[in-house]
Amino acid sequence: MSTPQNRIRNFCIIAHIDHGKSTLADRILEETGALSQREMTEQVLDKMDLERERGITIKLQAVRLFHRAEDGQEYQLNLIDTPGHVDFTYEVSRSLAACEGALLVVDASQGIEAQTLANVYLALENDLEIIPVINKIDLPSAEPERVKQEIEDVIGLDTSEAVLASAKTGAGIKEILEQVVTKIAPPKGDSEAPLQALIFDSHYDAYRGVIAYIRVVQGTLKPGMRIRMMATKKEFEVTEVGVFTPHMTFVDELKTGEVGLVAASMKNVQDVRVGDTITAAQNPAPAPLPGYRKVTPMVFCGLYPVDTVDYEDLRDALDKLKLNDASLIYEPETSDALGFGFRCGFLGLLHMEIIQERLEREYGLSLITTAPSVVYRVTTTKGEVMEIDNPANLPQVNKIEIIEEPFVKATVMVPKDFVGTVMDLCQGKRGIFSNMEYLGINRVMLTYEIPLSEIIYDFFDQLKSRTKGYASLDYEMIGYRQSELVKMDIMLNGEVLDALSCIVHSERAYTRGRALVEKLRSLIPRQMFEIPVQAAIGNKIIARETVKAMRKDVLAKCYGGDISRKRKLLEKQKEGKRRMKQVGNVEIPQEAFMAVLSIEE
């Protein structure tokens, strides 16, 4: 049975992490009878174990539900679950583009957080109808009236009809569904027009190849059609179209306004880009849907297998992850210290942690990761512009005209008691103050422009610890700016460890170098000979510590006796240590590579 276009509603849920988005989605599935009681698990839509454990949504999911509204009609509701995290902003923006409305879920005790705001602005840019939902009203600390006021003050949404709900107890779920039906507009579009469908996610299926999640904007999609991707110009023949009713179910066609999936024996996730438009090869649409852009990684790091024989396994694992995650990029690289590995690019720190954890968990690899770095832009004296994602590749100082680094606009929301300490932190991270705004009586929104390289180290951890966990952060790229940057090398026993090189601001280089060598001295196990640990910029050593040698008591056998006898033994030991030092290698523990991240200056 097919639903007429005016009875289709496409909506998504916007919320900050932990405001109860996935639980609310569970309740909605339960209310509409999409799943039997037996199949209900917590967070049905978060399919990966990792998502469940961390309580975050990483990949998008889309579900088709049927709901009989109070007017007696049956409506088709397509719920698109979105990730709430900064790193996945582009994915969120694409899934918002596939909807006509959004539920804005706000925690009744915590109020609005930074990422809620960021996503609301994205939703407003896409002209979505926003339905405010105050969640967790069953909590003793809930203050729904204050939160309503906050939403009105900060976002300017009318909250007189906001739904008070509790995803835990199931209160208010019926009202939410009624509001979805009455307030959100049905999809526009003409089912006779040339096909236009927006891809908002994809995943790889071992039997069917790549499966694209799509929203049909114009026209109709049926099995057997030849389709063309408008950004990559690739053509395929559709084998199956279907929907998720959380389980994959195949249907005869997807009509205008519907959300579903399409399989067309596509072998490579690269061909199916999020945000791209699918059209018919015979009768193509005149223009693609707006808003597509290529995803650019922001953070890079090196991944090396602990045991070099695992190199091929690591490559296979990355290939497989890449099938599901088009935003991951990687290329082989070698390091003198760590052997063969890959240089990988990620959307952000959370994305990086998740990929590392999936490699270790799903593919059983043990990895060494180098400190993350951002992409610097270097203009050489010859006028060439280079993008450097690995500090080891930075040209020599005398060949560099200017170095630029990426800046972000960071929005931090904090209770007003912590404003001082947060401003202090941002200035310490070379932040430039741009704005401060009071939201209600107790909360402040601070806006800073900060170099991305300062944020990827330990900004978030420090922010949380200085504000007792109350602050929330959101950031977006604002472009490149010129900075005084230098490359700092770490030398062990006189040899440069390329994996520990980092690019630092020249004012910070000394303190950073000092802190790093002290940290390394405590982490590197003592050897039979002494090891100098040095930080150098170019040829100039700026800091040094020494890992002292262990020594055997060679005088144990001499009872009394002549001093020259003892001296002979000590000289012999000293000579042995000197020879050992020339040939000796130093084993470096994994903690040493992560030390770069956690040093307090």
Swiss-Prot record:
InterPro entries per the record?
Answer: EF-4, EFG_III/V, EFG_V-like, EFTu-like_2, G_TR_CS, LepA_C_sf, LepA_CTD, LepA_IV
Q: Where would you say this protein principally sits, based on its record?
A: membrane
Database matches in PROSITE patterns? G_TR_1 (PS00301), G_TR_2 (PS51722)
Keyword Protein biosynthesis (UniProt): yes
Domain tr-type G residues, every copy: 6-188
Coiled-coil region(s) at which residues? none
Hey, what's the signal peptide range on this chain?
none
Q: What class of enzyme is it?
A: hydrolase
Any Pfam family the entry gives: GTP_EFTU_D2
The membrane topology noted for this protein in its Swiss-Prot or TrEMBL record is:
Peripheral membrane protein
| NCBIfam families per the UniProt record, alphabetical | lepA (TIGR01393), small_GTP (TIGR00231)
Q: What does this protein do?
A: Required for accurate and efficient protein synthesis under certain stress conditions. May act as a fidelity factor of the translation reaction, by catalyzing a one-codon backward translocation of tRNAs on improperly translocated ribosomes. Back-translocation proceeds from a post-translocation (POST) complex to a pre-translocation (PRE) complex, thus giving elongation factor G a second chance to translocate the tRNAs correctly. Binds to ribosomes in a GTP-dependent manner.
Q: Which family is this protein grouped under?
A: Belongs to the TRAFAC class translation factor GTPase superfamily. Classic translation factor GTPase family. LepA subfamily.
Name-wise, this protein is Elongation factor 4
